[in-house]
């Protein structure tokens, strides 16, 4: 597919690196473990473990949840909007998804679409190539383990009162998730909750306690 998710300039580049012994046989994020195992068999080496990942958008500010500062009519390019449009976009939240679909255009697998103003990933078809991650000027998209138990769907670093003015479902940094987590896996950093997946046991208490229901 030549998506470049492996870090090389296309499939040929990765293949050459594998043959030269400078890249792992399981280096293709799209092919995943099955392809890695086949290449390993051909090369006569161990495939090693491959953790399946999926793209995740850290924003829940849909059209009915996020406020707008003005109506925007212009080019659908998130980078140009972030760089040139007043306030970095029309949404009240300066950290939210711009909804213009640069990630959609970048995805070679048709796995991401803008729904109600926010990019949404289909985890069943996402190949974790990372193209959408590179395409987002707000740095809202990251690759997470496919079996991640709980995630925070917000990226705002504004204080709670400012978040409430901009989005009805934004993290307000109330610390309820942090205070109630029995595994010390959740912490509020820069006014937004973060979950340490190494410590998270999937108990779901943080999601239950979140008043904004942005922990999924």
Predicted regions and their residues:
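Ferredoxin-type iron-sulfur electron-transfer modules and their immediate structural context
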Residues: 1-180, 184-187, 207-209, 213-216
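Hydrophobic residues embedded in beta-strands of well-ordered beta-sheets
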Residues: 119, 192-193
């Amino acid at each position: 597919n030549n998506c470049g998710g492996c870090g090389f300039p296309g499939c040929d580049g990765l293949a050459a690196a594998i043959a030269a012994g400078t890249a792992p046989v399981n280096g293709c994020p799209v092919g995943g473990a099955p392809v890695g195992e086949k290449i390993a068999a051909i090369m006569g080496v161990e495939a090693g473990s491959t953790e399946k990942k999926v793209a995740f958008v850290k924003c829940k500010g849909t059209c009915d949840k996020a406020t707008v500062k003005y109506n925007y009519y212009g080019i659908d390019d998130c980078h140009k909007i972030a760089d040139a449009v007043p306030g970095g976009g029309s949404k009240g939240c300066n950290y939210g998804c711009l909804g213009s679909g640069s990630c959609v255009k970048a995805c070679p697998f048709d796995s991401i679409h803008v729904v109600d103003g926010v990019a949404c990933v289909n985890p069943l078809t996402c190949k974790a190539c990372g193209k959408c991650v590179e395409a987002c000027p707000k740095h809202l998209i990251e690759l997470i383990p496919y079996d991640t138990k709980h995630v925070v769907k917000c990226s705002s670093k504004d204080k709670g009162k400012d978040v409430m003015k901009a989005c009805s479902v934004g993290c307000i940094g109330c610390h309820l998730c942090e205070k109630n987590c029995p595994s010390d896996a959740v912490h509020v950093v820069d006014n937004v909750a973060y979950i340490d997946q190494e410590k998270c046991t999937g108990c779901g208490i943080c999601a239950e306690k979140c008043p904004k229901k942005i922990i999924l």
